[in-house]
Amino acid sequence: MARFSVCGGDDGEGPSNNNHQSRKRQRLPSIDENEEDAETSDAGSSGEEDEDETQNQGMRPESEDRGSTSDDSDREVVIEERRFGKFVNSQSSSSSKDSPLSVTLLDPDVLDCPICCEPLKIPIFQCDNGHLACTLCCTKVRNRCPSCTLPIGYVRCRAMEKVIEASRVSCLNAKYGCKESTSYGNRFSHEQVCVFTPCSCPILDCHYTGYYKDLNNHVRAEHKDDLISFVWNTRLTISLDLNKKTTILQEENDGHVIVVQVFRALHAVYVSVSCIAPLTPGVGRLSCRLAKITVDSLLKQGFMVKNIQKVTNEHPEDGFMLIPSYLFSGNDNLNLQIWIGHGRIFVHS
């Protein structure tokens, strides 16, 4: 137990020190009145009794003296702890002070700019009434606080800047495997390039969502019968069902999942090719070449494969080939040749 000095100095001898100690203890509300009376009567006792007491104490065994000293020390500690209204833990390590503190915000909007509602970024400004604004908003409002019309944009709020600088948030894709943590103001910038952006299974009525590499394994394990295998840079002939609209391909080695979709138009068919993967620089891009061959004609086109996270039925705006209806004679099946590879290998071939 930690030791504290109640008297504030060395232990003295004589009645003057005893009276000083008694007066200090009388001011402690946690000590019983009986204790105070006993101390007062002890202080007022005759010198002979004190001398006898001293002689008797000198005749006590050493172990008893040590026990008495320990009791007095414990009593001093309790008095000091009660005096300050708290208990002191003397064994707390200094390392706990340096460890990060986890704080939960009940309203995360307090870290957003109240004008544009975007995450606050340094520098942060305040008016004389304490209203906050980011740099861009100070310019937009012409340095006039929209809450109180006082000037804003000249005085920085250092306290909020320290809070923003010290705040770290986990990526929204943490449950899919991302271990990155960023400052609160830059979290959107990371999420736009996070490779763990969730992707949905392209198989109809399957609700699996996860990291795109995990999704590749899921498709291979759970939907093997619904896939058509292909090899990079190798020609594959496929028959597209115009009523089914979607055909799923998977690369034999890497497991990349490719979605080929057909969309009917008035006198033509759109054929789009997409890859189930996030739109991030960390994921490589693919290209493809489509060819429609008949006895009298050849229609061929190369383009970049678009990365998507979920299959939709919207007509594509790019990354497709338009095939006139006369090339497939109005049948419900469209036979095509397709090549898929890394980079831009098939864009201009």
From Swiss-Prot:
Give the SIAH-type zinc finger regions.
166-224
Question: What pathway does the annotation place this protein in?
Answer: Protein modification; protein ubiquitination
Entry's Gene Ontology molecular function annotations? transferase activity; zinc ion binding
**Gene Ontology terms: biological process:** protein ubiquitination
Q: Where does Zn(2+) 2 bind?
A: 201, 206, 218, 223
UniProt-listed Enzyme Commission number(s): 2.3.2.27
Q: Which residues cross the membrane?
A: none
Q: Which residues bind Zn(2+) 1?
A: 171, 178, 190, 194
Recorded superkingdom: Eukaryota
| Family membership | Belongs to the SINA (Seven in absentia) family.
* Function per UniProt: E3 ubiquitin-protein ligase that mediates ubiquitination and subsequent proteasomal degradation of target proteins. E3 ubiquitin ligases accept ubiquitin from an E2 ubiquitin-conjugating enzyme in the form of a thioester and then directly transfers the ubiquitin to targeted substrates. It probably triggers the ubiquitin-mediated degradation of different substrates.
Its recorded name reads E3 ubiquitin-protein ligase SINA-like 10
| Organism field | Arabidopsis thaliana
